[in-house]
Design a protein with these regions (language model features):
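A contiguous active-site-proximal alpha/beta segment in oxidoreductase catalytic domains
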Residues: 102, 125-185
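Rossmann-like dinucleotide-binding domain that binds NAD(P)(H)
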Residues: 185-254, 299-306
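C-terminal active-site/capping subdomain that shapes the small-molecule cofactor and substrate pocket
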Residues: 248-316
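Beta-loop-alpha module in the N-terminal Rossmann-like domain of NAD(P)-dependent dehydrogenases
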Residues: 69-119, 123-135
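C-terminal helix-rich "cap/oligomerization" subdomain common to oxidoreductases
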Residues: 3-19, 82-86, 94-96, 288-316
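Short hydrophobic segments within beta-strands
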Residues: 26-27, 51, 98, 148, ...
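N-terminal Rossmann-like dinucleotide-binding module
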Residues: 2-68
């Protein structure tokens, strides 16, 4: 996809903004859901229905207090079908998906089957063959699945990619990635601690970094897993233009001495690469592009899914 101007600048008097679109949201109580709610409102659209089995969703009041809310999928489905029969003014045009990882593809199928596009959090799916099934459904329905790969829209990452693309062929870089985000005992009991539901550490906390690195430095030529444990993974990647050492963990004991909370470090050829600022509106940018039909496609997201699945299955 190309780089786009902010949504408000892509329309003018001769090409006015289209009428607001209706959004449904699945996973309204999740930690990332407020970013989606904000993006829906910031792009001039309406959240009209939301779903989550947990009812701690007071955040909805900040964005769409009149949105219908459901704790059961069947009732949400019934409501969406009712809206569909009420005509284009009322139907869901998009469904935002923030549910647990292992439910993403099912909820994407729901969106497409009711005539809506899906905007799905990462990872889209846990296994590459599930992407093939979604591709077939896109072709059958004419609807699209747009993926949240917001790091590709970060100004610092875009500038890095432009720099790497302009270099002479054959030049290689050394990349060191460490990301440690401590999680308590609850993590092991929740769906996030079950690799069959979350995809494990590689999918759950690493996939957006893997996607970014492959977008900037090219395809995977070889990968090695040095540690593969329920709470931590470590390995090396040989990409087209870089050799990458990566270390991912949710174990508090892995935090370097002197640091508290989450620890993230990305070093390029020994120098720190800072992209800690500028995250605030990236989900809104993802929505802007999806609304213009130029979002991140199934083809864009597939390489990182293939990599994460292979890392999960590898023996250290």
């Amino acid at each position: 996809m190309g780089l786009l101007l902010p949504f408000a600048l892509t329309f003018d008097a001769l090409h006015p903004m289209p009428s607001p679109k209706n959004f449904g949201l699945i996973g309204a109580a999740g930690f990332v859901a407020p970013r989606h709610m904000k993006a829906i409102v910031d792009t001039g659209n309406k959240l009209v229905a939301a779903l989550d089995p947990n009812d701690s969703v007071g955040i909805i009041d900040s964005y769409a207090p009149n949105a219908a809310f459901f704790t059961e999928f069947e009732r949400f489905d019934r409501h969406a079908e009712k809206l569909r029969h009420m005509g284009d003014e009322h139907r869901l045009h998009y469904v935002s998906i923030c549910s647990p990882n292992y439910l993403h593809d099912a909820h994407c199928r729901f969106a497409l089957r009711i005539g809506a596009d899906a905007i799905c959090e990462k990872p889209l799916v846990l296994n590459p063959w599930n992407v093939d099934a979604l591709q077939e459904l896109e072709e059958e329905t004419g609807q699209r699945i747009w993926n949240v790969l917001q790091l590709r829209l970060h100004p610092a990452v875009i500038a890095l990619k432009e720099r790497i693309d302009a270099e002479s062929p054959g030049k290689r870089h050394q990349v060191d990635l460490t990301y440690i985000t401590p999680r308590g005992k609850w993590y092991d009991v929740s769906w996030k601690g079950d690799p069959s539901k979350s995809g494990g550490v590689a999918s759950n906390i690493g996939i957006h970094f893997f996607d970014m690195l492959m977008w900037v430095f090219g395809n995977v030529q070889h990968s090695t897993v040095l540690r593969n444990e329920p709470r931590s993974m470590k390995g090396e990647l040989v990409l087209d233009k870089a050799d990458v050492k990566w270390d991912l963990s949710v174990q508090a004991s892995d935090i370097p001495s002197g640091h508290t909370g989450a620890y993230r470090s990305l070093r390029l050829d020994g120098e720190p690469f800072d992209f800690s600022e500028g995250f605030g509106d990236l989900h809104t940018r993802v929505y802007e592009n999806a609304l213009l039909g130029d979002g991140f496609s199934l083809q864009d997201v597939t390489p990182s899914i293939v990599l994460a699945q292979s890392l999960r299955k590898a023996r250290s």
